[in-house]
Amino acid sequence: MKRPVVNCPQCGKSVAWDNSNPFRPFCSERCKLIDLGQWATESYRIPDTGKDSEKQENDPSGSEK
């Protein structure tokens, strides 16, 4: 059976997706820590649709209906 291969999300290097790589989907601990650091410094963000903030602005109590 052929081992699945993916690209490291940080550097793009080809990586085997199996138990022999403890850092998957990353190629190394270095790439894994770089990615973690980018989340910690808020370089990555999940887009806000603005729907929740609109509800809070319209309802001063902040409670949901």
Curated annotation (Swiss-Prot):
Q: Which Pfam family, giving just one, matches this sequence?
A: YacG
Q: Where is the composition biased (Basic and acidic residues)?
A: 48-65
Please list the cofactors this protein needs. Answer: Zn(2+)
Report the domain of life of the source organism.
Bacteria
What does the cofactor section's free text say about binding?
Binds 1 zinc ion.
Under InterPro entries, the record lists:
DNA_gyrase_inhibitor_YacG, Znf_NHR/GATA
Note the Gene3D superfamilies from the entry: Erythroid Transcription Factor GATA-1, subunit A
Q: Does the keyword Zinc apply?
A: yes
Q: Name one GO molecular function term.
A: zinc ion binding
UniProt KW keywords: Metal-binding, Zinc
Coiled coil start-end: none
Annotated Zn(2+) binding sites:
C8, C11, C27, C31
Q: Where is this region: Disordered?
A: 43-65
| GO terms classed as biological process | regulation of DNA-templated transcription
Concerning its family, UniProt says: Belongs to the DNA gyrase inhibitor YacG family.
Please give the PANTHER family that the UniProt record associates with this protein: DNA GYRASE INHIBITOR YACG
SUBUNIT field: Interacts with GyrB.
What is the stated purpose of this protein? Inhibits all the catalytic activities of DNA gyrase by preventing its interaction with DNA. Acts by binding directly to the C-terminal domain of GyrB, which probably disrupts DNA binding by the gyrase.
- Please report the name of this protein according to its UniProt entry: DNA gyrase inhibitor YacG
The record's gene field reads: yacG
